[in-house]
């Protein structure tokens, strides 16, 4: 996924790169909302929106209304998820998506990008419908166990870069609930 995302980013021609999965659905106004936000907040380097889930019948459920930017919360879990948008210059400056974090490559990227971003923005609207398929992380955070380990590594790297002395672990309640970190 990391290499494919980086290859796709090389082909893109705009000032911003939006990340979304091929089987998910953007709202009709998603890109317009992103453009409006960036025009009103020109220092924005990283941007995310609220989202919900969509099943095979097209029924939407489980809306995720996210808080505004919180660096402390992002160290706790990947609350950005979908829709995420980054300024191309920042994407290139930090080396894009790192290989070796598959399953949590987006989390690792978000941690690194927000460390360097001038402004991290939140559009408090559902702009993304995350498709729930059997065996996907949209259905369960423990559907892909390797994503947990990759997420732990991403946070360990982040606290090391920030010179924070801490132990990174997945809480028991998250393990028991089938959640990520």
Could you say what each language-model-derived stretch is?
Residues 56-79, 92:
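Short, flexible, basic/aromatic active-site loop/helix in glycosyltransferases
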Residues 13-14, 80-95, 132:
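Conserved nucleotide-sugar donor-binding
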């Amino acid at each position: 996924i990391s290499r494919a995302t980086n290859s796709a980013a090389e082909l893109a021609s705009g000032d911003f790169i939006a990340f979304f999965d091929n089987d998910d659905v953007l709202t009709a106004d998603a890109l317009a909302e992103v453009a409006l936000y960036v025009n009103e907040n020109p220092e924005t380097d990283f941007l995310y929106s609220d989202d919900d889930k969509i099943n095979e019948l097209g029924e939407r459920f489980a809306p995720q209304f996210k808080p505004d930017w919180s660096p402390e919360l992002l160290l706790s879990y990947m609350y950005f998820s979908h829709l995420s948008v980054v300024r191309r210059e920042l994407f290139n400056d930090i080396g894009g998506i790192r290989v070796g974090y598959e399953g949590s490559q987006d989390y690792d990227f978000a941690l690194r990008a927000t460390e360097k971003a001038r402004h991290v923005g939140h559009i408090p609207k559902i702009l993304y419908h995350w498709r729930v398929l059997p065996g996907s992380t949209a259905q369960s955070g423990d559907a892909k166990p390797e994503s947990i380990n990759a997420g732990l590594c991403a946070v360990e790297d982040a606290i090391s870069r920030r010179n924070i002395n801490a132990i990174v672990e997945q809480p028991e309640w998250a393990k028991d609930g089938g959640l990520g970190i």
